[in-house]
Each structure stands twice: as C-alpha cells, then as structure tokens.
Amino acid sequence: MNYEFEREIGFINSQPSLAECLTSFPPVADTFQSSSIKTSTLSHSTLIPPPFEQTIPSLNPGSHPRHGAGGRPKPSPAGSRGSPVPAGALQPPEYPWMKEKKAAKKTALLPAAAAAATAAATGPACLSHKESLEIADGSGGGSRRLRTAYTNTQLLELEKEFHFNKYLCRPRRVEIAALLDLTERQVKVWFQNRRMKHKRQTQCKENQNSEGKCKSLEDSEKVEEDEEEKTLFEQALSVSGALLEREGYTFQQNALSQQQAPNGHNGDSQSFPVSPLTSNEKNLKHFQHQSPTVPNCLSTMGQNCGAGLNNDSPEALEVPSLQDFSVFSTDSCLQLSDAVSPSLPGSLDSPVDISADSLDFFTDTLTTIDLQHLNY
C-alpha cells in the first residue's frame, strides 16, 4: 500500500481517492461491536431505548453489501430476536419521574374527595372559613379556583385597613389574616383587587372631570359665539336703521323741496297780485269812507277795464288781465272773495250807483278763479 502511495505521489496533482483511503485501513473487529451492543441491550433494556443504528437497517454496518462481500460475519438472528427492539420502537418508555408526578396528582385528589365525601355523609359540620375555602379549592380539580366569599365583617375590616393603608407589609398582612380567619394569600389578593378598583374609580372621575371641563369650555365658547353673533346682528340692524333714517330724511327733504318748489312759484305768482289786492282793499275801504268820490273812481276803473279788454292801449297793460288771474292759488282766491264780498252788500246798500261794466268785471274774475281752482 505504501508502494502505491509513493507511486501516485510521483505524478503531478495526483491525490489518493476517498475509496482507496477507506479500503486501505484494516476493518474494525465486528466481534467487539456485537458484544458491546448485546451487553448494552441486555443490561439497559428497560431504561435506554435501542441504538439508532439498529432501528434503521441501512445504517447497520453489517447490512452493507460491500462489507458482506468482504467476508464479515453477520449478526446472529438469535441475538436480534432476543433484544426487545420492536417494543421500544413502538412504545415510548416510561421514566420514574413521570410515574411520580402522576402518582402525586392522584394522591392530592384523593384526600380532597374523601373529605368532601365525609362532609356530605356526616351532614352540615361546623367548619371554619379557612377549611371550607381549602376544600373548595381542592375540589375544583385545579382547573378553576372558586371565588372567595367574604363576610360583611371581613369586608368591613379590609375596607377600613385599605382606607388607611393601600399597601400592607408582611407582618400586618399576617396579623389581619389571623384576625379575620383568612389566609395570607387571600388578604394579598383582596388588596390587589381593591387597588385596581380604586385606580379605575379615580381614572373615571378624572375622565368625567376632564369631559365636564371640556363641555363647560365648549358651552362658554358657544355662548361667546352667540353673543358675538347677536352683537354683530344688532350692529347691522343699527347701521341699517341709520341708513334708513338717512334715506327717509333725504326723501322727506326731497319731498319738501319738491313741495316748496311749486309753492315758491305760487308765492312768486302771489306776490304779483298782492299789490292789487291790497290796493283793492284800500280802495274798497276808501270807497266806504268817501262815498261822494266813488262814482268817479269806479267810472274811471270801468273805463280803463273796458279799454284794456277791448283795445291794446298802454294803460291796459298795467291792469291785471284774465291770464294773470289764472296763476292765483286757493289762498289768494279766498282772500279775494273775503275782500270782495263785504264790499258788495255795502255798495248795494249805498245810494251810490255802480255801473254795469264794473259788476261784469268782478263776476268774470270770480268765475275764472273758481274754474281754475276746480281744474287744479
């Protein structure tokens, strides 16, 4: 073999193959392997499962075809039959610690069931609160623990203690448990639950207070917004009222100015006939006081009026014509009627003779004034 290695080393990049290396080593003694397997299976057949090589025949060195061809002795069938290989492969072994755990569970359940059976058989016995709770805890079977039922006195004392101390030290907890006939664990659990309840209550109160504050803030904001809207509305109303007042005032001023404009024209027209009216009144008064001279004045007036109506003389232009009387207003008509009416009966009663032309002139003027007043 060494000669073969030396011969191959002479070539470049020549290395021995894996098959040559495996075949070059001497085979391991099959007797040692078989004896060790037999002793192990016989001594630890109950505790240790069979080796992995025996369960899978392809991994067994004796089943390899090359080794079988090499003249290795096969394991005896008697030894393979004597070993409990199929039992270990089908069923997992049971170890001592597993047996102890199951036995402990069964023994723990038996006394509780026996105690419950004795209590039921003997009738209502006088048991303490702690023993009844222990029986209830044990009879639950470990699946679910029953809820502890506290008496009113126990709850009162626990609430009193919680009011002063939210957390209990161990000596105080032991003392309370001894006084109230409870276990230390029950007192501890009660205080834990009570602290959680207190926390929930405080959180709910804080949330309610915060919500109340938020609501109050929202309400105040809404009230402020409403007040602002009201003030804006009132301001708008006041502004609109002021505008309406101004518009009404301007409208009234315009109406007054429009009314004053024709009145002004009437006033201008009234100013023209005022002098003849006043002169007529004076003349009428003068007629009453000076009766002898009246026929001369009236005759001259009648002649002048007739001349003004018939001829285009310059004297006729001074006398108001019929067109000038068309501008008279109602006040001027009333004044004229008041001025003329008292003079007529006086003139009729007086012995003075009035000509027909002057009477015709007065009647014509009055009829024209009345017609114009009706048309207006």
UniProtKB/Swiss-Prot annotation:
> Major place of localization?
nucleus
Q: Where is this motif: Antp-type hexapeptide?
A: 94-99
Gene Ontology molecular function terms on file: DNA-binding transcription factor activity, RNA polymerase II-specific; DNA-binding transcription repressor activity, RNA polymerase II-specific; RNA polymerase II cis-regulatory region sequence-specific DNA binding; sequence-specific double-stranded DNA binding
Q: Which SMART domains does the record cross-reference, listed alphabetically?
A: HOX
Q: What is the superkingdom listed in this entry's lineage?
A: Eukaryota
In terms of PROSITE patterns, this protein maps to: ANTENNAPEDIA (PS00032), HOMEOBOX_1 (PS00027), HOMEOBOX_2 (PS50071)
Q: What SUPFAM superfamilies has UniProt attached to this entry?
A: Homeodomain-like (SSF46689)
Tagged with keyword Isomerase = no
Keywords in alphabetical order: Developmental protein, Disease variant, DNA-binding, Homeobox, Nucleus, Transcription, Transcription regulation
DNA-binding residue intervals = 143-202
Record's InterPro entries?
HD, HD_metazoa, Homeobox_Antennapedia_CS, Homeobox_CS, Homeodomain-like_sf
Q: Region Disordered: list its residue ranges.
A: 42-93, 198-229, 257-279
What GO cellular component is one of the record's annotations? nucleus
BP-aspect Gene Ontology terms = anterior/posterior pattern specification; brain segmentation; cell fate determination; cellular response to retinoic acid; dorsal/ventral pattern formation; embryonic viscerocranium morphogenesis; middle ear morphogenesis; motor neuron axon guidance
Q: Name one Pfam family in it.
A: Homeodomain
Q: Where is this protein localized, as stated in its record?
A: Nucleus
Q: Does the UniProt entry include the keyword DNA-binding?
A: yes
**Involvement in disease:** Microtia, hearing impairment, and cleft palate: A disease characterized by microtia, mixed symmetric severe to profound hearing impairment, and partial cleft palate. Microtia is a congenital deformity of the outer ear that is small and abnormally shaped. In classic microtia, the pinna is essentially absent, except for a vertical sausage-shaped skin remnant. The superior aspect of this sausage-shaped skin remnant consists of underlying unorganized cartilage, and the inferior aspect of this remnant consists of a relatively well-formed lobule.
Q: What does this protein do?
A: Sequence-specific transcription factor which is part of a developmental regulatory system that provides cells with specific positional identities on the anterior-posterior axis.
- Give the similarity note: Belongs to the Antp homeobox family. Proboscipedia subfamily.
From the Swiss-Prot or TrEMBL record, give the protein name: Homeobox protein Hox-A2
Give the species this sequence originates from. Homo sapiens (Human)
Per the record, the gene is HOXA2
